């Protein structure tokens, strides 16, 4: 619905942009401002996309003789329209997809890409493939003709249409990943924006003779006819999806999870929750959820058949019922017996099995929270990959080691630093030394150590990561007196640009490279508890699961991939009250201390305030024992008000500037 409303408003916005751009009518700025505000509160991601599309259109429309004043005023007006809605905008940008890590955001972006062979194939709609993205061969042909034949000042929309078409292809994804605001670059959704500016340029093509105008209209209409057969879009819910939704609804006490990578369609998101049904972990627009990262990792675990992680984290999310689409079992060589064994480790029992789906039920209270003890914590940008491979580790909430207290980190057996950051290297090194002295095993992934601000070298605790490039596979490793071989690098990473270790006194692992023995693993000269690992070996193991690499990584970390965190289910109750909720934990086992952190299995929201201590742990709301009263408070209200004031002031300045320029022009 929000996208439909935006599609309705977009032509009017483009009209006002055209009026000011071509005729410099000041009243058009009011239209741009109001429509930008309306679209902002309708769909924040779409206004970001429209802003990007408008910027590109105005960039292509720029002509030296005309200057850039009008283009700048239009863009500034749109920015002010967004800022004026700051009271709503600032809270909406907190959490969800805006805070999604780059890897997860990249996976979402991939879902909104399409090969040219599909996006320019009109037969897909005729053959019944209604789910395929179709850009429009007619739009492409007319855009090419417009670029070649239209007036230079009136072809910007044609250029934009072709540029957006190219940007919808998977080949461009590596570039888009590195762009600012990449979370908003769901490229196939830019199509409606491309259409809007395309039709603007088509209307402006004044030299187009009447026969060619008629021919253009005919081409567009003929291309659109298959899309007008609306009955083919009235598709009944997938029978398997309906059946699974009913199965989950009838067997769930607290929350259900369907692991199907959305292959069963959108119905389960609706069907599980209807008729007095159950809560649901996913939901069709899960990308905007506070638990978007958690959900993305569950999907990734299913794709990689990492069932230990999938089912353990399902407990963390409060799923007492988990259904797995059977077509994904075996994709990486696992069997249903392997899945059942992983389920048993997390307390699940296989209760239903068909050729379509298998259903697992958690043994425990109907409504429960979770107390968890992890073996270790991974701090840094690449934490998620490590936790997928070693589920007994948790991913830290921050990549900056200085955001943690030493006492907090001392509660873990192992701390892994991979892609981490710090404010001052000296303080970070002191923290690591202190942890090691207290008996904590600290593993430093030297491949992703921050570069020194002065020397630009990747150095930490006197150990340096030196660049090296390997082809196809690692050399044979010499580790702990044993020769260890590994399989090749992933096909898309055949050239492995990484680094070896120098400066370490106690080398534990070496490899031969150009007649030299170079180090890839070592321990600190002052503490056996500090371990260095290079060659991006941790990442390699996380993506390949190679048995040779597993031997080394398992020894360095001191844990097995099969290990799981220790979880205890606690009976819990929650009740929504007027303007808040009450969470009660009265029946905690005797071995659970009063100071225990209890994951309520409810997503943490920034609207929660309480006189009791509440915490955000891995995007979940955590409380203590007893009764916790939580009130709902409008989040980030005053920062939002400040942003709105900035927007009003900015628009006032733009209006004054536009009036002055108009007066000068009139004189």
Name the predicted role of every residue range.
Residues 1-247, 308, 319-324, 331, ...:
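Membrane-embedded transmembrane-helix bundle of lipid-linked glycan/lipid transferases
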Residues 96-101, 260-267, 571-574:
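A glycine-rich phosphate-binding loop feature that marks nucleotide/adenosyl-phosphate handling sites
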Residues 358-360, 518, 529, 581, ...:
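Short beta-strand micro-motifs in enzyme catalytic cores
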């Amino acid at each position: 619905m929000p996208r439909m409303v935006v599609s309705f408003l977009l032509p009017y916005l483009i009209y006002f942009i055209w009026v000011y751009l071509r005729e410099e009518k000041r009243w058009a700025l009011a239209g741009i401002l109001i429509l930008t505000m309306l679209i902002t509160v309708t769909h924040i991601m779409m206004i970001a996309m429209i802003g990007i599309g408008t910027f590109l259109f105005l960039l292509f429309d720029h002509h030296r003789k005309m200057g850039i004043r009008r283009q700048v005023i239009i863009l500034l007006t749109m920015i002010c329209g967004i800022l004026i809605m700051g009271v709503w905008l600032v809270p909406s940008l907190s959490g969800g997809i805006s805070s999604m890590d780059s890897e997860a955001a990249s996976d979402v972006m991939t879902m909104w890409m399409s090969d040219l062979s599909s996006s320019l194939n009109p037969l897909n709609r005729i053959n019944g493939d209604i789910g395929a993205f179709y850009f429009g061969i007619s739009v492409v042909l007319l855009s090419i003709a417009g670029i070649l034949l239209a007036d230079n000042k009136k072809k910007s929309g044609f250029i934009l249409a072709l540029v957006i078409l190219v940007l919808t292809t998977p080949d461009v994804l590596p570039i888009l990943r590195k762009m600012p605001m990449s979370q908003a670059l769901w490229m196939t959704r830019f199509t409606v924006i491309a259409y809007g500016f395309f039709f603007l340029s088509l209307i402006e093509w004044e030299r187009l003779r009447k026969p060619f105008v008629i021919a253009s209209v005919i081409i567009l209409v003929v291309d659109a006819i298959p899309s007008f057969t609306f009955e083919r879009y009235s598709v009944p819910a997938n029978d398997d999806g309906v059946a699974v939704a009913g199965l989950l609804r009838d067997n769930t006490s607290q929350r259900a999870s369907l692991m199907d990578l959305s292959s069963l369609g959108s119905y389960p998101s609706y069907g599980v929750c209807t008729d007095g049904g159950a809560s649901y972990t996913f939901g069709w627009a899960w990308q905007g959820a506070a638990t978007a990262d958690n959900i993305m990792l569950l999907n990734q675990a299913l794709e990689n058949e990492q069932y230990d992680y999938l089912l353990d984290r399902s407990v963390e999310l409060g799923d007492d019922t988990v259904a797995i689409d059977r077509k994904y079992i075996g994709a990486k060589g696992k069997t249903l017996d392997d899945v059942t064994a992983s389920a048993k480790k997390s307390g699940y029992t296989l209760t239903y099995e068909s050729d379509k789906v298998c259903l697992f039920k958690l043994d425990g209270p109907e409504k429960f929270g979770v107390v968890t003890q992890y073996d270790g914590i991974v701090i840094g940008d690449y934490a998620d990959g490590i936790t997928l491979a070693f589920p007994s580790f948790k991913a830290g909430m921050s990549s900056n080691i200085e955001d943690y207290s030493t006492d907090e980190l001392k509660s873990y057996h192992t701390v892994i630093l991979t892609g981490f950051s710090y404010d001052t290297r000296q303080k970070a090194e002191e923290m690591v030394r202190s942890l090691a002295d207290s008996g904590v095993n600290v593993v430093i992934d030297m491949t992703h150590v921050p570069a020194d601000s002065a020397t630009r070298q990747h150095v930490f605790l006197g150990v340096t990561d030196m660049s090296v490039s390997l082809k196809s596979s690692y050399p044979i490793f010499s580790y702990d007196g044993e020769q260890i071989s590994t399989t090749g690098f992933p096909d898309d990473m055949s050239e492995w640009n990484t680094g070896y270790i120098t400066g370490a006194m106690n080398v534990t692992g070496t490899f031969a490279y150009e007649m030299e023995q170079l180090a890839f693993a070592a321990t600190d000269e002052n503490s056996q508890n500090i371990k260095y690992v290079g060659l991006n070996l941790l990442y390699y193991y996380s993506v390949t699961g190679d048995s040779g690499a597993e031997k080394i990584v398992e020894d360095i970390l001191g844990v097995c991939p099969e290990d799981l965190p220790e979880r205890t289910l606690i009976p819990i109750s929650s009740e929504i009250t007027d303007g808040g909720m009450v969470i009660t934990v009265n029946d905690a086992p005797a071995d659970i201390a009063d100071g225990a952190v209890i994951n309520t299995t409810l997503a943490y929201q920034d609207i929660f305030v309480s006189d009791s201590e509440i915490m955000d742990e891995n995007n979940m709301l955590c409380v203590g024992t007893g009764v916790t009263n939580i009130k709902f408070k409008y989040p980030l209200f005053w920062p939002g008000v400040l942003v709105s004031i900035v927007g009003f002031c900015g628009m006032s300045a733009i209006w004054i500037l536009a009036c002055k320029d108009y007066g000068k022009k009139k004189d």
